[in-house]
Amino acid sequence: MPGNQGGANWGSTAAHPTDGTVYVIGFNVPTLIRLLKPGETRPARAGSPAQVVQEGRYVTDGFGLFPTIISPPYTTLTAYDLDAGTIKWQIGLGDDLRLAGKGIRGTGSAATVKGGLISTATGLVFATAADRKVHVYDSANGKQLAELPLGGATSGAPSMYEHEGRQYLLVTAVEAPWPDGAAVHTGPTGLIAYALPQRP
């Protein structure tokens, strides 16, 4: 069943500078959409604690149901070998916070992906995910090397730049409600620049 918020979009693709690998974020959560008949009452979003009811004839009364009708991972990060035409590896990107609170990790986030990727020649992939973290992976095998908590949701692809001989990773984090009352992380918001510690 297709969804209207993916598979791959929002700057969710990056290429390794030299080895022919492309990394793609995919969102795998289905959406049920229909039109209302004239005079028909718009239903609340069943399954969502917010019970949001909006005006209009466009209705997504199946979106927001949890757990979804598919198994995790809900969001994936996939490495494609363009020379061989094969998948090198695929992992769940981030965590669904409702499941992570129960000790279930690696599911990929079930929230809409609005982040992006950067791949470096030194073998790293930086990915912003809907779980409000920056994830750092080994580009060779998809092993997670680090995760950096943010104080808000990311929107748009991260950037990388150099200033005075030092390399920086720039991401955005915007305060927004958490889906379905999931736990809030504490972390920075706004434009956030990361860099490795300077050597003495």
Question: Which stretches of residues belong to each language-model region?
Answer:
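A fold-level detector for beta-propeller and closely related beta-sheet-rich head/sensor domains
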Residues: 1-200
